[in-house]
A protein has these predicted regions:
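Conserved ABC ATPase "signature" region
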Residues: 102-118
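Conserved ABC ATPase signature
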Residues: 122-126
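Catalytic Walker B motif of ABC-type/P-loop ATPase nucleotide-binding domains
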Residues: 147-151
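Helix N-cap at the start of a conserved alpha-helix in ABC-type nucleotide-binding domains
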Residues: 158-160
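H-loop/switch region of ABC-family ATPase nucleotide-binding domains
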Residues: 183-184
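H-loop (His-switch) and adjacent beta-strand-loop-beta switch element
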Residues: 195-209
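ABC ATPase nucleotide-binding domains
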Residues: 214-216, 221-251
Length: 251
């Protein structure tokens, strides 16, 4: 039986010049867990992911188990709409770089429901949701068992956002993946996360959603009363015949 954590972070500190972004952060993540990273803007959520990927310098210890195979989906990639590259070619580039068999691309695109029409389309012409799915497919090539997501639904419409989160939940369930997810959506965090890691200018905190997502904790974290965005699925389950609410509350 495996007992050691997949990820262990000890006394992590990150500074940019004289500004401390993360100070003395320690936490662990185990196989199959979904860890949501929350906090106000500027708290260091994206910085933490970049440090976990060893893309930026840091002080302290970040230890990945030898079992960990990482995939990463950034918050945003700017693509020239005139770029003569199809979604399929974009994915094949990684396939060839990793020397993977062609069947893996077929398996991943089938699992994510990527159609031939989408795969053959110029990557610069895709909608936000379509491009996000392609980025997830890109991350899944190579059989990772850990996925790091930096606000995977930023700037997406409500329905597309819901579908992306359903997809992430399916990946965690069906593949027993460990997921580290930066999100401002407290509704998604409360429903899907096993653990919540709070980053703020004060002392970081970590625990299950019921322990962390309390009015008192969120008031301290955000210095404002928390608001939850009620998703389509939640609203329809409670009110099958009612109109979908249009207010979007987030922290």
């Amino acid at each position: 039986m495996i007992t050691d954590p997949l990820l262990s972070v000890r006394n992590l500190s990150i500074t940019f010049g004289s500004r401390s972004v993360i100070h003395d952060l320690s936490f662990t993540a185990n196989e199959g867990e979904a860890v949501a990273i929350i906090g106000p803007n500027g708290a260091g959520k994206t910085v933490l992911l970049r440090a976990l990927l060893r893309l930026i310098p840091y002080q302290g210890e970040i230890q990945w188990s030898h079992r960990a195979r990482l995939g990463y989906v950034p918050q945003k990639i700017v693509v020239d709409r005139q770029l003569p590259l199809s979604s399929r070619d974009f994915l094949i580039a990684k396939l060839r770089f990793l020397k993977l068999p062609d069947k893996e691309l077929e398996q991943v695109t089938t699992e994510l429901g990527l159609t031939s029409q989408l795969l053959n389309a110029n990557i610069g012409t895709l909608s936000g949701g379509q491009f996000q799915k392609v980025l997830i497919a890109f991350a899944l090539l190579g059989h990772p068992n850990v996925l790091l997501f930096d606000e995977p639904t930023a700037s997406l419409d409500e329905l597309t956002e819901e579908r992306i989160y359903e997809l992430l939940h399916s990946l965690q369930t069906n593949r027993a993946m460990t997921i580290l997810l930066v999100s401002h959506d407290l509704s998604v965090v409360s429903r899907n996360a096993d653990l919540v890691l709070c980053l703020s200018k004060g002392k970081p905190c970590m625990g299950p959603p019921k322990q962390i997502l309390t009015p008192e904790m969120l008031q301290e974290l955000y210095s404002a009363p928390p608001q939850y965005y009620r998703h389509i699925a939640e609203h329809e389950a409670a009110n099958p015949s009612a109109d979908i609410p249009r207010e979007r509350g987030r922290c």
